[in-house]
Each structure stands twice: as structure tokens, then as C-alpha cells.
Amino acid sequence: KDALVYGQMNEPPGARMRVGLKDGSITSIQAV
């Protein structure tokens, strides 16, 4: 999941949120 969080940092907020919700980890979005 750490790799996902780092990967999300390169994505726009919208994509980041969708990936976070799809993965079911809201905390990863808040961490970013």
C-alpha cells in the first residue's frame, strides 16, 4: 500500500481520491 500512496502523489487530487476510495483506504488520502 505504501507504493500506492507514493504513486498517488503523482496523480491529480481527483484521481488520487478515486484510487483511495477504490482501495478503501481514506487515511492514505488524508496523509497526502
Swiss-Prot record:
Domain of life: Eukaryota
Function: Produces ATP from ADP in the presence of a proton gradient across the membrane. The catalytic sites are hosted primarily by the beta subunits.
Single GO BP term: ATP biosynthetic process
UniProt EC number: 7.1.2.2
CC annotations in GO: chloroplast thylakoid membrane; proton-transporting ATP synthase complex
Coiled coil spans: none
Gene Ontology molecular function, alphabetical: ATP binding
Expression induction: The 56 kDa isoform is constitutively expressed. The 54 kDa isoform increases 9-fold during 10 hours of high light stress and decreases after 24 hours of photoinhibitory treatment.
Post-translational modification: The N-terminus is blocked.
Family: Belongs to the ATPase alpha/beta chains family.
Main EC class the enzyme belongs to: translocase
Location relative to the cell: Plastid, Chloroplast thylakoid membrane
Mode of membrane association: Peripheral membrane protein
Catalyzed reactions per annotation: ATP + H2O + 4 H(+)(in) = ADP + phosphate + 5 H(+)(out)
Keywords: ATP synthesis, ATP-binding, CF(1), Chloroplast, Hydrogen ion transport, Ion transport, Membrane, Nucleotide-binding, Plastid, Thylakoid, Translocase, Transport
Designated name of the protein: ATP synthase subunit beta, chloroplastic
Major localisation: plastid
Taxon lineage: Eukaryota, Viridiplantae, Streptophyta, Embryophyta, Tracheophyta
Description of how the protein assembles with itself and partners: F-type ATPases have 2 components, CF(1) - the catalytic core - and CF(0) - the membrane proton channel. CF(1) has five subunits: alpha(3), beta(3), gamma(1), delta(1), epsilon(1). CF(0) has four main subunits: a(1), b(1), b'(1) and c(9-12).
Note: Two isoforms of 54 and 56 kDa with the same peptide fingerprint are found in the chloroplast. The synthesis of the major 56 kDa isoform is coupled to the assembly into the thylakoid membrane, while the 54 kDa isoform accumulates in response to various light stress conditions.
